[in-house]
């Protein structure tokens, strides 16, 4: 099992290109199941989760070709040969549930295993299922699988009110509704840029959608969808992660392809901590203003609030901030598993339920640490960049699910980082 060795060695300077959004691409890929015409995705990220979704779609009979080094995905679902998403593939990634709505909408039936992915709290799929039931689907959970069947004549438009904001449930319902008979209204829908990106792609395919980016999305079902070519939106989580690298280490880094509107609430916290963020012709330039970072309080919220997927990385920054910071996790349970590993590096962190109190120290110390999930893995790398001595991060297969060429991108800015094959 691979690990990553990081040596703390001062400031970072240079440019880092930001990839297409993993979470957007994982929703866009199943959209091919809605049509018998080709779907081409450009600016695709090159990640293990994308390969897993490719395997899943191919197991259903879809064709997926990776072109231009993986940055272009050519997909086609002319004739599906199977409507069963098996546990062996689905267990690797929670986004696998997103094939359910499209298959049900297009062909009227689907069998999908309950999903896997990062071990972060409960993260139930009941919101997905209730939305599909509102459209008339008959659902039966048995033997670890969701057996779904549409009513005669297909899914029907419905008013769906999500009791909690859910990105995945919004995506599943949005895709299913494009082929449902009549009008579907999604209320308390997720507002994330990935939802907007999916809606834009579906509209290119012929869907009739209004209101994406707001909490109410209206979809008028159509008889069929066509093909399209669509660029995947910039990954705001990768963007925020690499914005924190010069914030933690000092120096100045330009993030190519970055846009303020993708990370507005995050930028507000960086500004309060003493980090400068400026727009450039090609992206965003980030630098630490003067001296030590200042403590700030953070509460994770659905978009446009502070993203839960940047909480672990923000904690790494605040470990060496001047003063005491409070981080409140409002999205997922059990999402402070990186805290004990940061404590091994000398951080002062106390966790009580969904709240972590971080008292800044002058310097972290390198240590062997273990990644517990995707975002925790990169937070430990960031901490290692600013620590004295060497940090070895093990179990970095988590990292490969969400960050492409992380060692190459950071070393190009002066970081001492390399992968140790396991």
UniProtKB/Swiss-Prot annotation:
User: Where do the annotations place UDP-N-acetyl-alpha-D-glucosamine binding?
Assistant: 94, 123-127, 309, 331
GO molecular function terms attached to this record = UDP-N-acetylglucosamine 1-carboxyvinyltransferase activity
Localization terms from the record: Cytoplasm
Checking Pfam families in the record gives:
EPSP_synthase
The biological pathway it contributes to is: Cell wall biogenesis; peptidoglycan biosynthesis
| An individual GO BP term | cell wall organization
Which keywords belong to this entry? Answer: Cell cycle, Cell division, Cell shape, Cell wall biogenesis/degradation, Cytoplasm, Peptidoglycan synthesis, Pyruvate, Transferase
User: Listed GO cellular component terms?
Assistant: cytoplasm
CDD domains (alphabetical): UdpNAET
Sites of 2-(S-cysteinyl)pyruvic acid O-phosphothioketal modification: 118
Q: Which HAMAP family match?
A: MurA
Assigned protein family: Belongs to the EPSP synthase family. MurA subfamily.
What is the protein name for this chain? UDP-N-acetylglucosamine 1-carboxyvinyltransferase
To which species is this protein native? Cereibacter sphaeroides (strain ATCC 17029 / ATH 2.4.9)
The coding gene here is murA
């Amino acid at each position: 099992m691979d690990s990553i060795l990081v040596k703390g060695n001062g400031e970072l300077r240079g440019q880092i290109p930001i990839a297409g959004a993993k979470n957007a691409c994982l929703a866009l890929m199943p959209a091919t199941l809605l049509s018998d015409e080709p779907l081409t995705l450009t600016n695709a990220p090159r990640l293990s989760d994308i390969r897993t979704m490719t395997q899943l779609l191919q197991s259903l009979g879809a064709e997926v070709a990776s072109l231009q080094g993986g940055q272009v995905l050519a997909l086609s679902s002319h004739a599906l040969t199977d409507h069963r998403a098996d546990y062996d593939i689905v267990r690797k990634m929670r986004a696998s549930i997103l094939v359910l709505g499209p298959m049900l909408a297009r062909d009227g039936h689907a069998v999908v295993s309950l999903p896997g992915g990062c071990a972060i709290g409960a993260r139930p799929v009941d919101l997905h299922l209730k939305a599909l039931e509102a459209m008339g689907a008959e659902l039966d959970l048995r033997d670890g699988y969701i057996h779904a069947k549409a009513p005669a004549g297909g899914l029907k438009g419905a008013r769906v009110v999500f009791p909690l904001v859910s990105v995945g449930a919004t995506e599943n319902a949005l895709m299913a509704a494009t082929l449902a008979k009549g009008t579907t209204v999604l209320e308390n829908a997720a507002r994330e840029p990935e939802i907007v990106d999916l809606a834009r792609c579906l509209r290119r395919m012929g869907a009739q959608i209004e209101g994406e980016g707001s909490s109410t999305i209206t979809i008028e079902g159509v008889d069929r969808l066509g093909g399209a070519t669509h660029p995947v939106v910039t990954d705001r989580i990768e963007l925020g992660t690499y914005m924190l690298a010069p914030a933690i280490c000092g120096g100045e880094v330009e993030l190519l392809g970055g846009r303020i509107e993708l990370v507005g609430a995050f930028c507000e916290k960086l500004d309060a901590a003493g980090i400068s963020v400026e727009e450039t012709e090609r992206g965003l330039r980030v630098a630490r203003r003067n001296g030590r970072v200042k403590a700030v309080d953070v509460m994770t919220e659905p978009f446009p609030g502070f993203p839960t997927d940047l909480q672990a990385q923000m904690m790494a920054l605040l470990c060496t901030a001047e003063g005491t910071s409070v981080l409140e996790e409002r999205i997922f349970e059990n999402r402070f598993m990186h805290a004990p590993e940061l404590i091994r590096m000398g951080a002062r962190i106390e966790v009580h339920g969904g709240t972590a109190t971080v008292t800044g120290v002058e310097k972290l110390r390198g240590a062997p640490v273990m990644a517990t999930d995707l975002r925790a893995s990169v937070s430990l790398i960031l901490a290692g960049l600013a620590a004295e001595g060497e940090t070895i991060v093990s179990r970095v297969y988590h990292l490969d699910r969400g960050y492409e060429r992380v060692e190459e991108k950071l070393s190009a800015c002066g970081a001492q980082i390399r992968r140790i094959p396991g």
